[in-house]
């Protein structure tokens, strides 16, 4: 009996190893993984953690902006902000649906959010004290989100990748809306210009933190890159965001709140 059990365990290990090799071969060939496909348990758990955190962030992200719907400076601004908050709710629902394809139910996801077991982006805990914050959030926070999320349209898990296509299109609208608010303020009175600079000062660093820890300190990046859940490292995406955002700030006449930021001639 002991020998039989030992043989069974060896055979199970061989089968599991073969399945993992076939799985990684599909990943390496850029073949998407679908819900009915075999996947390592660690891959499934990693996706649940990432997708649920993403979904929670979309839902919680409605709160600081919803706060300003009744205080928007014009009917046009109010309608645009309502549309944006509505989009964020939809993004959360798409992502919860994607997470459910991995075998976890929505009630469990929400329970983990409410009990604090699950995380969401801490940037949404920062106060929104002026209307300029609505511009800075759209421009910087949604801009950072786009930088993170566009590569997810090519992530290895099919339902997540397909959900991200629509999410990214709508986030692009949000980013343009925020930048347009900042542009209007930068062309306004001296008080409005100061308001825009103040919002930029407060949201610049939290936006950079949205890309996660540095590559050397990231616990998950290496494996997520191997599985092609992620396509680029945290530091690569953060650098791209800086390269794109600094010229936009200069066009607005704003000063980047980092005296150590310099142009790298060697990188170009």
Task: Name what the model sees in each region.
Residues 32-52, 112-138, 155, 188-192, ...:
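Acidic/His metal-coordination segments adjacent to aromatic residues that form catalytic metal sites
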Residues 37-43, 60-83, 145-160:
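Helix-loop segments that flank and shape redox-cofactor active sites
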Residues 7-43, 75:
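Extreme N-terminal leader/anchor segments
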Residues 12-22, 79, 84-112, 179-183:
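Conserved alpha-helical segments that form or flank metal/cofactor-binding pockets of metalloenzymes
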Residues 43-54, 72-91, 134, 159-171:
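Alpha-helical scaffold segments that form or flank carboxylate-/histidine-based iron centers
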Residues 104-180, 198-206:
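Active-site-proximal alpha-helical scaffolds that flank and shape metal-associated catalytic sites
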Residues 193-268:
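Extended, helix-rich structural scaffolds rather than catalytic motifs
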């Amino acid at each position: 009996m002991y020998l039989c059990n030992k043989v069974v365990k060896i055979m199970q290990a061989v089968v599991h190893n073969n399945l993992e090799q076939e799985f990684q071969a599909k990943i390496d060939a850029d073949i998407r993984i679908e819900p009915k496909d075999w996947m390592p348990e660690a891959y499934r758990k990693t996706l649940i953690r990432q997708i649920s955190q993403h979904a929670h962030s979309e839902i919680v992200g409605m709160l600081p902006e919803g706060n300003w719907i009744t205080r928007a400076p014009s009917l046009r601004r109010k309608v645009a902000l309502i549309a944006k908050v509505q989009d964020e709710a939809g993004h959360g629902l798409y992502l919860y649906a994607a997470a459910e394809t991995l075998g976890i139910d929505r009630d469990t996801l929400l329970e983990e959010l409410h009990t604090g077991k699950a995380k969401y982006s801490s940037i949404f805990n920062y106060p929104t004290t002026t209307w300029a914050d609505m511009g800075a959030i759209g421009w910087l926070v949604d801009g950072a989100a786009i930088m993170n999320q566009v590569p997810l349209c090519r992530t290895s898990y099919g339902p997540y990748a397909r959900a991200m296509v629509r999410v990214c299109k709508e986030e692009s609208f949000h980013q343009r809306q925020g930048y347009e608010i900042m542009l209007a303020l930068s062309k306004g009175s001296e008080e409005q210009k100061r308001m825009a600079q103040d919002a930029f000062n407060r949201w610049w660093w939290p936006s950079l933190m949205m890309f996660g820890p540095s590559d050397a300190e990231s616990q998950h990046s290496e494996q997520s890159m191997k599985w092609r859940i992620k396509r680029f490292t945290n530091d690569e995406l953060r650098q791209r965001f800086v390269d794109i955002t600094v010229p936009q700030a200069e066009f607005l006449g704003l000063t980047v709140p980092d005296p150590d930021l310099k142009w790298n001639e060697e990188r170009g």
